Amino acid sequence: MTHEEHHAAKSLGVGKAIAVLTSGGDAQGMNAAVRAVVRVGIYTGARVFFVHEGYQGLVDGGDNIREATWESVSMMLQLGGTVIGSARCKDFREREGRLRAAHNLVKRGITNLCVIGGDGSLTGADTFRSEWGDLLNDLQKAGKITAEEANKSSYLNIVGLVGSIDNDFCGTDMTIGTDSALHRIIEIVDAITTTAQSHQRTFVLEVMGRHCGYLALVTSLSCGADWVFIPECPPDDAWEEHLCRRLSETRTRGSRLNIIIVAEGAIDKNGQLITSENIKDLVVKRLGYDTRVTVLGHVQRGGTPSAFDRILGSRMGVEAVMALLEGTPDTPACVVSLSGNQAVRLPLMECVQVTKDVTKAMNEKRFDEAMKLRGRSFMNNWEVYKLLAHVRPPVTKSGSYTVAVMNVGAPTAGMNAAVRSTVRIGLIQGNRVLVVHDGFEGLAKGQIEEAGWSYVGGWTGQGGSKLGTKRTLPKKSFEQISANITKFNIQGLVIIGGFEAYTGGLELMEGRKQYDELCIPFVVIPATVSNNVPGSDFSVGADTALNTICMTCDRIKQSAAGTKRRVFIIETMGGYCGYLATMAGLAAGADAAYIFEEPFTIRDLQVNVEHLVQKMKTTVKRGLVLRNEKCNENYTTDFIFNLYSEEGKGIFDSRKNVLGHMQQGGSPTPLDRNFATKMGAKAMNWMSGKIKESYRNGRIFANTPDSGCVLGMRKRALVFQPVTELKEQTDFEHRIPKEQWWLKLRPILKILAKYEIDLDTSEHAHLEHITRKRSGEATI
């Protein structure tokens, strides 16, 4: 990309004006999107206006439409809800209201509108756009605007961002606010679990979501619920008997509690509502269990946005500004959405149409079609949930393969969830599943035992590694490992862990030349806070670590804001991989994030200090700088702290914080629980097929490259890649992949921190069509 093209982004908005509004129900992460729209808009040279109180503010005008400044969006990232206010507006539904709204925009020269809201808000925006020409004609005839004003504002560009906790909008894998709502729900479920266990109770939890079962479904996966009721898939006619049998079976197997999740719009096959109270009465009457109902209500909309929602809001906000400024009269109104980890632009009305089709299909009781229209991600969640929850473990081991599961590397949140789903899917398939304690060391020493269904009960929400994990690699113990593979008749190996799990896999591949016993299929599930395993864009555990860092940064920023003129330097984990520092920097609103992948010099440090000196002259008198632990062996945290302290004398003082091992701990986030559960299920399904494929002359013999893989999330799909193929893509000295997708987000971090850089800011999301996306491979 040429310097001229880089520079073009900085002048793209000159002479243009953008208005941003939040409409409909609030959602955590909306503020991150508003902040990004304002700052990137200003960066491109445009004027940006807040529209307070949603469409109502657009109709009423006056003080509701105010110009935004860089500082006016400071300290917004960590706040829930929407700072600029939202309202459900009747006036805008009438043409008269839209006429007043058009008048208010034209008078201010605003021709670009960014709407953050649900499907209703976005449909309203599209109607407004299609009527724009007629509205201007009417205003001109009435003498409210001049011909020149009408000419200047001849067309209106509209871009939508989907902000809704329900995740009910077709065309995007995740809407802004969904992940945070799941955080609130899971916090409550975890808290309820302890009291339910104490009293051997059954809890019926009602979650929000209107006519969409996404929150209920993912909650069930993330907490291992006994049953879930969602509107898209009503239960069979005899569901009362099935439910009661399921609950009593769980108790018979030794469980002290039952959790039932109900979506607020849950219905039966005849379209009749299934309420929490109905279910409670049923359980009490038929089983006599002590049963309680908890309706979660508006708690789900509140609280601090999760790291995921802050990053999603920021990325979508940046892309929205670019889509608006690149728009022409012929460009359709679009929605910026997420597919896998890719930002994409989709025609707004195509998405709205599919969303309406879901409602129509459900009203007409075409539930299978409604499920399909929700998309691949929803379908996958449902398939995995059904597998794990609605099957009785077989009494006999019909498949009778023996698969061992182990953890390797450093402990990380979500490992236990992956072990649980691997073990249970294995048992459902009729296999014998063994668990190995303490990684490859335990495999060599024979620390191996058989796992039954109840062995992994309640593991989903527990942090760390219950099996125990070591960084030891297998090479030195091939003799003992081979002996134990024979002794325990291990025919497949599921390795859950970080970079050591991957290098261990490579060593097993090498060892096959000498030891026939090692010729068994194995699969590596990446699980590490560092997110540095080649072959996967995400690792289990990284999201939990990111949220821990974020929470700490919020508290530190609060302290700095109270003290005034203070800069905090925070050291994050990650080895040589800068993922945590970069993403936490984006989520916490850091001024800089130093990482190994982007070499920096003393001049860069000087620029950062000068930038902070300038910042202290504004109303925002605090600074936050993140440093990855191994970003530079000479520019250490102490060095940077000393440099900042010296250079900032009299202007600001500095403090440093090394976060350390708290980043590995804690209860896994909903995203990590869900991701780990799906990865475990996918890995075990692959394993059964691979063992069958490798079965020759009464024994397993697998020596092809594709019998040893890493299961990874790549853009929009879960893929199995042979470890030998990934070798070329790995920087072994620094334990990182040679190419990392998140590096393209670094410019956004710098622009949002007000650096005058000539860098390409957009992710260049192309306009796709929803039909093409549906047939794509979005699997998570």
Curated annotation (Swiss-Prot):
One of its GO terms (biological process) is fructose 1,6-bisphosphate metabolic process. Mg(2+) binds at residue 119. Glycans are attached at residue 530. Belongs to the phosphofructokinase type A (PFKA) family. ATP-dependent PFK group I subfamily. Eukaryotic two domain clade 'E' sub-subfamily. Residues 391-401 are annotated as: Interdomain linker. It catalyses: beta-D-fructose 6-phosphate + ATP = beta-D-fructose 1,6-bisphosphate + ADP + H(+). The active site is at 166 (proton acceptor). This is ATP-dependent 6-phosphofructokinase, muscle type. It is found in: Cytoplasm. Its cofactor is Mg(2+). Substrate binds at residues 164-166, 201, 208-210, 264, 292, 298-301. The modification N-acetylthreonine is found at residue 2. Residues 2-390 are annotated as: N-terminal catalytic PFK domain 1. It comes from the Eukaryota. GlcNAcylation decreases enzyme activity. The modification N6-(2-hydroxyisobutyryl)lysine is found at residue 557. Pathway: Carbohydrate degradation; glycolysis; D-glyceraldehyde 3-phosphate and glycerone phosphate from D-glucose: step 3/4. The modification Phosphoserine is found at residues 377, 667, 775. One of its GO terms (molecular function) is 6-phosphofructokinase activity. Homo- and heterotetramers. Phosphofructokinase (PFK) enzyme functions as a tetramer composed of different combinations of 3 types of subunits, called PFKM (M), PFKL (L) and PFKP (P). The composition of the PFK tetramer differs according to the tissue type it is present in. The kinetic and regulatory properties of the tetrameric enzyme are dependent on the subunit composition, hence can vary across tissues. Interacts (via C-terminus) with HK1 (via N-terminal spermatogenic cell-specific region). Allosterically activated by ADP, AMP, or fructose 2,6-bisphosphate, and allosterically inhibited by ATP or citrate. Beta-D-fructose 2,6-bisphosphate binds at residues 471, 528-532, 566, 573-575, 629, 655, 661-664, 735. Catalyzes the phosphorylation of D-fructose 6-phosphate to fructose 1,6-bisphosphate by ATP, the first committing step of glycolysis. Its EC number is 2.7.1.11. The gene is PFKM.
